[in-house]
């Protein structure tokens, strides 16, 4: 036996969401973003399912790409933050990893580091996010340097990133899209701008390649829509079980600080999951979990290893019953809203002690 706190990853949901993406972006190449351990869903679980069904995996760094290769997955990988030192270039080219170039230092490393094979590159341009990327007026010089470098593959791509795509009404979105579309420098063989939110809201931004992240895992990129609204299915189910049940007298205080009590006798269930597992500590009152086909409210403070739920009106629920913290029935978007954060953060903050099943 082991602690019941676990993640259940649904391959069929992942494939459904990929199908939805391809329906929204017909004929477009797909880079599946699997950085940060596939948004917490587990790259070991996700990458083999998607292998051969997409054009590339998007990762943040060399280490993440090597972890995918170690799984025996053959789909190409793209390092979205590029290399962090010139030494990484030889490892990247030996493993056929493509690199994003987003600043002059990376370009200099590439030009001054002879490589045994041509390396595939994408150039990132800053169209308004002001985080990574060359300025538009620098692109001509960048392209010139790449075209004359004999160890650069000439299938060079151009990409940018939208700062406000999750807020489709913001004028900055169309401004960035227009700036990107107006770039007419020859030599760029493929272009990419659309993340999850843009795939849905800005079909004209899909260009040659789309880059789904959060929607691939069945979570909405928008604050006012959830997965079901978008025809997506949650890939991650964060599960645990009830480890204890106590019958308490009226006005018994529950948990740290005694922040919750009832003016009548109560029945309190203890669930083996807490903020040490990645469940948010700061949630609003009556945030639900799913037990035996219904929602049950969390009461009291979430502690490191446990949380407590009110079973007063649910006498049939027993020790050992499964609890869905978020997933198919209680969408992670609801928990994120309750915690004052976003689904991205909750998926990515699952701790190492939570096992995958």
From Swiss-Prot:
Substrate binds at residues 131, 304. Its EC number is 5.1.1.1. GO terms for biological process: D-alanine biosynthetic process. CDD domains: PLPDE_III_AR_proteobact. It comes from the Bacteria. Signal peptide: none annotated. Belongs to the alanine racemase family. This is Alanine racemase. The gene is alr.
């Amino acid at each position: 036996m082991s602690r019941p706190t676990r993640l259940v990853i649904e391959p069929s949901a992942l494939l459904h969401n990929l199908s939805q993406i391809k329906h929204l972006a017909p004929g477009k190449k797909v880079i599946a973003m699997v950085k940060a351990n596939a948004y917490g869903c587990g790259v070991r679980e996700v990458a083999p399912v998607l292998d051969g069904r997409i054009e590339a995996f998007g990762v943040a760094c060399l280490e993440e790409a090597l972890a995918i290769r170690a799984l025996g997955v053959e789909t190409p990988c793209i390092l979205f933050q590029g290399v962090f030192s010139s030494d990484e270039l030889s490892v990247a080219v030996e493993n056929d990893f493509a690199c994003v170039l987003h600043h002059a230092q990376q370009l200099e490393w590439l030009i001054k580091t002879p490589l045994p094979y041509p390396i595939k590159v994408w150039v990132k341009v800053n169209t308004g996010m002001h985080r990574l990327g060359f300025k538009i007026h620098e692109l001509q010089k960048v392209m010139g340097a790449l075209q004359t470098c004999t160890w650069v593959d000439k299938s060079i791509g151009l990409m940018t990133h939208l700062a406000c795509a999750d807020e489709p009404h913001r004028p900055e979105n169309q401004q960035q899209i227009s700036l990107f579309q107006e770039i007419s420098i020859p030599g760029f063989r493929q272009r990419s701008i659309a993340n999850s939110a843009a795939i849905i809201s800005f079909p004209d931004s899909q260009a040659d390649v789309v880059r789904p992240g959060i929607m691939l895992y069945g979570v909405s990129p928008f604050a006012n829509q959830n997965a079901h609204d978008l025809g997506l299915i949650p890939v991650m189910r964060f599960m645990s079980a009830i480890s204890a049940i106590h019958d308490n007298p009226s006005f018994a205080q529950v948990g740290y600080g005694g922040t919750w009590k009832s003016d009548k006798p109560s029945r309190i269930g203890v669930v083996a999951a807490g903020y040490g597992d990645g469940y948010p500590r700061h949630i609003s009152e009556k945030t639900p979990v799913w037990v035996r086909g219904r929602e049950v409210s969390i009461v009291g403070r979430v502690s490191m290893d446990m949380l407590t739920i009110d079973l007063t009106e649910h006498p049939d629920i027993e020790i050992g019953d499964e609890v869905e913290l978020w997933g198919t029935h209680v969408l992670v978007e609801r928990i994120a809203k309750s915690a004052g954060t976003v689904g991205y953060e909750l998926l990515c903050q699952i701790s190492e002690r939570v096992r995958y099943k």
